[in-house]
Amino acid sequence: MAGLPVRDPAVDRSLRSVFVGNIPYEATEEQLKDIFSEVGPVVSFRLVYDRETGKPKGYGFCEYQDQETALSAMRNLNGREFSGRALRVDNAASEKNKEELKSLGTGAPVIESPYGESISPEDAPESISKAVASLPPEQMFELMKQMKLCVQNSPQEARNMLLQNPQLAYALLQAQVVMRIVDPEIALKILHRQTNIPTLISGNPQPVHVAGPGSGPNVSMNQQNPQAPQAQSLGGMHVNGAPPMMQASMPGGVPAPVQMAAAVGGPGPGSLAPAGVMQAQVGMQGAGPVPMERGQVPMQDPRAAMQRGALPTNVPTPRGLLGDAPNDPRGGTLMTVTGDVEPRAYLGPPPPPHQGPPMHHVPGHEGRGPPPHDMRGGPLAEPRPLMAEPRGPMLDQRGPPLDARGGRDPRGLDARGMEARAMEARGLDARGLEARAMEARAMEARAMEARAMEARAMEARAMEARGMDTRGPVPGPRGPMPSGIQGPNPMNMGAVVPQGSRQVPVMQGAGMQGASMQGGSQPGGFSPGQSQVTPQDHEKAALIMQVLQLTADQIAMLPPEQRQSILILKEQIQKSTGAP
């Protein structure tokens, strides 16, 4: 011993240390330290553990401050009984013990010990896993505890330490997996996700090798902060962890368990955890926005779609379409087909509140509409209103004039005002129109009634009422009811169908024709008291004219129900008037 060069620090350390053998497996370093402190202050005591099993090998090394104390320990403590075993205390500088010390890298206290033998980056993950697995549970727990404190107290220093020692970060992650603080799957994801994180490793850049080395350390940092993200994901993992997932490499080789603890004691990577986690989150977020955008793109204004659906393809005058179309459940109306203008357009001021939708301004002779004779006029055009109200307001066929009250009609149309406007726009003489329409069908009312009865029992009745009731505006038995409360209008209700809102539109055209015809026929049959033709009569006459003048193409575009009712009406009118 005396011949050994004392100038070499490593040798000096070995001279100050003693080898302790035959240690009971259940003994702890603290207990042994207490025993060896009897001869003098102990700098460090270290038990040696099997890296494969993590169990103690039954021997260790005790380092004193000077060689004299070490010699005293060998003299006084050799053979000391502890837990039923006689401790063997020998010189740590012996050839055999020297080799042991060298392989374990225990030449100095834990805090000062080097990393140990260097290994290739490819083998680093496995080495780290073995080193971590060899740590006894209590030591592993202590390691995590120290790391937590380090991160809490010195986040930046801890971060730097882990960045510069990726193997430590990886070991901490592995330890968390073994302790079931972090789920193995999550650990793998963290490692792989952060491969793009630059690693600031000093010395050998062994970090990367299978699962994103650089990222490994950083990732672990996240997890090192047990309190942080890692603690959140609790999963179970086998003790040895997944070396494959750990791709950070140890520059110096596997840190000894004690060394790791010491290293952990250093500043903690507080910010690391956040950074790693943030990155993972960011990656995920990236994908999030895209789907959303995609979802948004398809979004369209529902109203636009409705309007489009409503627009008739061949409507000559789309002017009123916008107004009507959107509400038309069928996506189209007579009006749209006939190219009529939006009823509301010519209505002028909005209907009074008590009035319903101006839809049934059916009079539809909008200024822009074709001349009264043009059946395409607004009248038919707006079946929707009727749909809304099965009773089809303005078309109250039962009352001679549309609704004697005109504007009071639930739709709020001022029949008279509308008619006046419509007539003016067309430049038609109200009376002339009435004369024409009524004359043409003066006799027709009764004939129509008979035919209509076959196709539309209700309509026939309504017509009959009109044809027979010469009193004109005076409400007949089925006359219009008080404003806003219309009983079922036979005409408005589909033929034979009880006020089905869906048929109302169809019948509206027909009903209107019938009504106007009847109204028109009344001029001839007006009783003395009714020498005047009311605006409603003109309105109805105009409606009939519009229906009659619908072209075959326009009729073909209508829904089957409307088309059928209009064809029947035209046929009946032609038969009754003898028109071609």
UniProtKB/Swiss-Prot annotation:
Gene Ontology CC annotations of this record: cleavage body; mRNA cleavage and polyadenylation specificity factor complex; nucleus
Tissue: Expressed in most somatic cell types (at protein level). Highly expressed in testis, except in meiotic spermatocytes.
Positions of region (Disordered): 311-331, 347-414, 512-536
Induction: Up-regulated during the G to S phase transition.
Residue ranges, annotated region (12 X 5 AA tandem repeats of M-E-A-R-[AG]): 413-472
Keywords: Isopeptide bond, Methylation, mRNA processing, Nucleus, Phosphoprotein, Repeat, RNA-binding, Ubl conjugation
Basic and acidic residues biased stretches: 363-376, 405-414
Region Interaction with RPO2TC1, annotated ranges: 517-580
GO molecular function per UniProt: RNA binding
Primary localization: nucleus
Annotated Sequence repeat ranges: 413-417, 418-422, 423-427, 428-432, 433-437, 438-442, 443-447, 448-452, 453-457, 458-462, 463-467, 468-472
Compartment annotation: Nucleus
Covalent cross-link Glycyl lysine isopeptide (Lys-Gly) (interchain with G-Cter in SUMO2) as placed by the record, residue numbers: K189
List of residues that carry Omega-N-methylarginine: R308, R471, R478
PTM-bearing positions, type Phosphoserine: S14, S521, S527
One example of a Gene Ontology biological process annotation: cellular response to nerve growth factor stimulus
Region (Interactions with CSTF3 and SYMPK) location: 108-248
Domain RRM: 16-94
Role, per record: One of the multiple factors required for polyadenylation and 3'-end cleavage of mammalian pre-mRNAs. This subunit is directly involved in the binding to pre-mRNAs.
Subunit composition and interactions: The CSTF complex is composed of CSTF1 (50 kDa subunit), CSTF2 (64 kDa subunit) and CSTF3 (77 kDa subunit). CSTF2 directly interacts with CSTF3, SYMPK and RPO2TC1. Interacts with HSF1 in heat-stressed cells. Interacts with CPSF2, CPSF3 and FIP1L1. Interacts with DDX1.
Name listed for the protein in its UniProt record: Cleavage stimulation factor subunit 2
Organism: Mus musculus
Lineage of source species: Eukaryota, Metazoa, Chordata, Craniata, Vertebrata
